[in-house]
A protein has these predicted regions:
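C-terminal non-catalytic regions of proteins with extracellular/luminal or membrane-system context
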Residues: 1-29, 101-105, 109-111, 210, ...
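Extended catalytic-interface subdomain
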Residues: 328-332
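Conserved, charged catalytic cores of large soluble enzymes
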Residues: 333, 443, 450-465
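N-terminal beta-rich core of secreted/periplasmic extracellular enzymes
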Residues: 3-276, 281, 306-323, 347-414, ...
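A Trp-anchored, charged/polar loop motif used as the substrate-binding/catalytic surface
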Residues: 301-310, 525-530
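Binuclear metal-dependent hydrolase catalytic cores centered on His/Asp/Glu-rich metal-binding motifs
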Residues: 282-304
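Short acidic, glycine/proline-rich loop/turn micro-motifs
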Residues: 232-236, 284-285, 333-336, 554-559, ...
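Histidine-centered catalytic/metal-binding microenvironments
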Residues: 461-475
Length: 677
């Protein structure tokens, strides 16, 4: 029995009846008029899960083990979007993967219609990629839950999402950051890291928890525990910087903020990613693509020293699930695996993707590091990024992954492959499954759902969802954190704070939508009373917000080098220098990667670093109305040659004295550097 065996939880039943037993109320989820063990909230989640698994059909078990993207009825990503429509009722098929663009062998179900997915394919886990207002999100969540409650066993839906609480003036990226602006907006992950404040992360995680659960989202694909040891990787901006102790502290605290000291009915479940560390990229290329599929470790002991500690911190905090990355580790690596986990006496690795490697998932993650929750694959490991197991059929890939510990498959909407794997195994095929192979994973998944309290009450109040999303205190914390995160790199001539009466020229340099963001910054300055001009010739001072970027799905190309030179990533360096030579210029560098600054820094009057910030909050810093406190969360490299020579598995702060950039005043732009105004 649970600790609160007699404490009546709130029961909300909309499609099924209730039962009264011993003066207590329970949901009659299977509709038989009797209290089944899985309906009895006095039992532990593990006991309830074991009972429910025993009642589930093979098809229901297979459906539970997929988590696919799902859209609202008016979503532009739905097959037939209809303005104002709440539920998407149309199946949608695709001939290529939506994230990697890899062609499928045959058309794949990209997303189910709501009722077809829940009632026919028995799916319960969904990825939310739309970005509606919180009350609309809550209404949609409730509608899905009511369909699920009306199913044979009444198993509720679990909605998950990538992060939603970071300010963004850049276009959204499918599969990475799709949503912003509807909840309290904090700086990007690197901006949080710039404050070196683990206690803040506990508060931040709690804000996410309150706002998401109020809107009917139950789990986050986050946060990233990856160490960004290769500066050219396009996902550096999703990390907490390069200091392994701070990253570990941050991952622990944000997980505790989201989940609490232990997972419970008010928790936001965390899926920490990408085990055992996705930052070890070959020349920056990502394993979403076949040319970036390998993890090659040049430094002995780097896995244990740098890449595993943040995941251990997540596990120590009770992270509900872990997501392995697509990569496959290679035997040209230095020695990084414990000898007892080597593939053979002479080979560390089987050279298959982490999700398919029993030594990584079951033996290292579960056995040695103590993971007690479930393993959630990354998107597309079966049909798009099956690195190292391409020779297997898709059902055989499902079978192999299940046997190596994967419990749920991301961005899958069709359980047919799992059912085919069981059919193959039960017909005697050695590379298939039997139904019993699905049951441990189903039990782990159901344990989370029971622990989250969704069997008793999965419904939320839309009005409350909107109120919590717009909570003034939470929004103020986010805005204050944005302002504090800014890093002062140089201001030795006193260019800052800006003078309101100085005629100011403003420019934003970025690859896409630069005029739009320039307009946002000009509007914010104008509202603050700053005198603006349209040309350099009229100006007495200038602000250039330099926003270079490496986009995962457009810049990572086969045979094309990835660069961290701003000139290669949307910045007109000649124009920047022209402005700097004409008038005293404050250069604001938005740091999503460790940029090479030798062409743009020397002629600037002042240099700041941002890590995603709204225009209004940046203006507050420029005018001296807010105090920037940030320190560099990444070491800025001296040159492209320094980047190429550095080991891809060691952070910049440990790459030696010849690695960091030194500015015109002699400041060394290494991890933790930053001045004050």
């Amino acid at each position: 029995m649970t600790d609160n065996a007699s404490s009546q939880p709130r029961i909300d039943a909309r499609a099924k009846g209730t039962l009264t037993v011993d003066g207590l109320t329970f949901k009659d989820l299977d509709g038989d008029g009797q209290l089944a063990p899985y309906e009895d909230w006095r039992l532990s989640p593990q006991e309830r899960a074991a009972d429910l698994v025993s009642r589930m059909s093979l098809e229901e078990k297979a459906g539970l083990m997929i988590i696919g993207s799902h859209y609202m009825g008016d979503s532009p990503l739905a097959k037939n979007p209809t303005p104002g429509k709440l539920l998407n009722e149309d199946d949608s098929w695709a001939d290529k993967h939506p994230i990697s663009g890899a062609p499928f062998e045959k058309p794949v179900l990209a997303t189910s219609g709501a009722r077809q997915g829940i009632l026919e394919r028995h799916q319960r886990f969904y990825i939310v990629r739309d970005n509606p207002e919180a009350d609309r999100l809550a209404e949609w969540s409730n509608a899905l839950q009511e369909i699920a409650e009306g199913s044979r066993l009444g198993i509720p839906v679990v909605l998950t999402s990538n992060p939603r609480n970071h300010v963004s003036v850049a276009p959204p990226t499918f599969g990475v950051t799709e949503a912003a602006g509807k909840f309290a907006d904090f700086p990007g992950e690197l901006g949080l890291a710039a404050l070196q404040d683990p206690a803040l992360m506990r508060k931040f995680g709690d804000v996410c928890r309150q706002q998401w659960r109020a809107a009917g989202i139950h789990k986050m694909y986050g946060y990233m525990a990856d160490m960004p040891t290769e500066p050219r990787w396009s996902r550096v901006n999703g990390t907490f910087g390069e200091d392994v102790q701070l990253v570990s502290d941050y991952v622990r605290e944000v997980t505790l903020g989201m989940q609490g000291e232990k997972l419970g009915p008010d928790s936001l479940a965390a899926t920490v990613k990408h085990f055992p560390g996705g930052g070890v990229r070959l020349d920056g290329h990502d394993p979403h693509f076949h040319w970036g599929q390998t993890n090659e470790y040049p430094t002995s002991g780097s896995l244990e020293k740098y890449h595993l500690p943040p995941f251990q911190a997540a596990l120590d905090a009770g992270a509900s699930s872990i997501m392995p990355y697509y990569s496959r580790p290679m035997n040209n690596s230095a020695e990084v695996m414990p000898k007892n986990l080597w593939f053979t006496d002479s080979e560390q690795f089987e050279e298959v993707a982490f999700a398919y490697d029993d030594r990584i998932t079951n033996q290292l993650l579960r056995g040695q590091m103590g993971h007690a929750g479930y393993i959630n694959s990354d998107s597309g490991i079966i049909d798009a990024m099956p690195w190292g197991v391409e020779h297997l059929t898709e059902p055989q890939r499902f079978a192999r992954a299940v046997k190596t510990g994967v419990d749920i498959f991301s961005d899958m909407s069709d359980p047919a492959g799992i059912l085919e794997a069981v059919a193959e195994g039960e017909a005697g095929g050695e590379l298939g499954l039997v139904e019993a192979d699905l049951e441990p994973g189903c039990a782990r998944l159901l344990t989370e759902i029971f622990t989250l309290g969704l069997f008793e009450n999965p419904y939320v109040d839309p009005a409350n969802a909107l109120a919590v999303a717009n909570d003034a205190e939470m929004k103020a914390l986010g805005a204050d954190t944005q302002r504090r995160s800014v890093t002062v790199l140089r201001n030795e001539v006193g260019a800052l704070p800006l003078k309101r009466d100085a005629k100011l020229y403003v420019d934003v340099q970025q690859r896409k939508d630069s005029l739009f963001v320039t307009g946002l910054l000009r509007d914010a300055l104008r509202e603050a009373g700053v005198t603006l001009v349209d040309t350099i010739e009229e100006a007495e001072a200038a602000v250039i917000w330099m926003r270079p970027s490496i986009f995962l799905f457009t810049d990572d190309k086969e045979g094309v080098p990835i660069s961290v030179n701003p000139a290669d990533n949307g910045v007109d360096v000649d124009h920047v220098v022209e402005v700097q030579n004409a008038v005293p210029t404050t250069l604001v560098v938005n740091v999503t990667n460790p940029w090479i600054l030798h062409e743009v820094e020397p002629d600037a009057a002042a240099v700041l670093a941002t890590y995603e910030i709204s225009a209004a909050n940046l203006v507050a810093v420029l005018l001296g109305e807010a105090t920037p406190e940030g320190k560099l969360p990444l070491t800025m490299p001296r040159s492209a040659e320094a980047v190429a020579a550095a080991p891809r598995d060691v952070p910049g702060l440990d790459c030696g004295d010849d690695y960091p950039y030194i500015d015109r005043a002699g400041n060394v732009y290494t991890y933790g550097y930053g001045q004050t105004l």
